[in-house]
Amino acid sequence: MPRVVCWHTLKSLNGYKNLSSGAETREGLRSSSPVDLPLRPRKQATAAGQRKLLSLQLLLCACTSVTDLTYWGPAGHGATAPHRSLLAIHLHLVPASSAAMKATGPHNAQTQVNPQGHAPSAEDPTGTWTVSGPCKDHPHPFLSQSNPPTRISSALPLKTDSALEQTPQQLPSLHLSQG
């Protein structure tokens, strides 16, 4: 069953050096083909310790779902350490969450949305939806639809397959001299 594991939790429980696999680094090993090494975790964290740290850090960092605690394969020649890969995943997820929080935060000057039934205020005396954008010359197409949807004019006759079969004289005919 998958568990949610955060990089901060792994760092706190296992330490930086214990995030790598049990595979040993062998100096001077040069081979063009990958070497099969047994993978085993260095240290398993207790579930209670994980829950405690996750409850404290859940709001502070983006987490990723993994099936087990950090089983890492052997790194290639010149590759970074496995805990740096996990750190890159963590740092990749955090800006997206920060951007989403800033976009909906109270200090965003571009878009202000008040929920339905909100108490009237100085900015919104009626207490209804208020959406203001940076381009007032070009209103939002979904919020300002003044024209009804375009309808097909009844003056244009629509021909079905049966109507085309009844009027074959209107279809151009090909002669052998044309082809």
UniProtKB/Swiss-Prot annotation:
Record key words, sorted: Acetylation, Activator, Nucleus, Repressor, Transcription, Transcription regulation, Ubl conjugation
Molecular function GO labels: DNA-binding transcription factor binding; protein homodimerization activity; transcription coregulator activity
One GO location term (cellular component): nucleus
Keyword flag Transcription regulation: yes
Modified residues (N6-acetyllysine): 43
Coiled-coil annotated spans: none
Localization terms from the record: Nucleus
Region ranges (Disordered): 100-179
Chain intervals with Polar residues compositional bias: 143-153, 163-179
Predominant location category: nucleus
Tissue localization of expression: Specifically expressed in fetal liver, cord blood and bone marrow. Also expressed in the K562 and HEL cell lines, which constitutively express the fetal globin genes.
Maturation and modification: Acetylation at Lys-43 prolongs the protein half-life by preventing ubiquitin-mediated degradation and reduces the interaction between NF-E4 and HDAC1, potentially maximizing the activating ability of the factor at the gamma-promoter.
GO annotation (BP), single: regulation of DNA-templated transcription
Subunit description: Component of the SSP (stage selector protein) complex, which appears to be a heteromer of TFCP2 and 2 copies of NFE4. Interacts with HDAC1 and PCAF. Isoform 2 interacts with TFCP2.
Known function: Functions as part of the SSP (stage selector protein) complex, a complex that contributes to the preferential expression of the gamma-gene in fetal erythroid cells by facilitating the interaction of the gamma-globin genes with enhancer elements contained in the locus control region (LCR). The complex binds to the stage selector element (SSE) in the proximal gamma-globin promoter. In contrast, isoform 2 acts as a repressor of gamma-globin gene expression by preventing NFE2 and RNA polymerase II recruitment to the promoter.
Record-given protein name: Transcription factor NF-E4
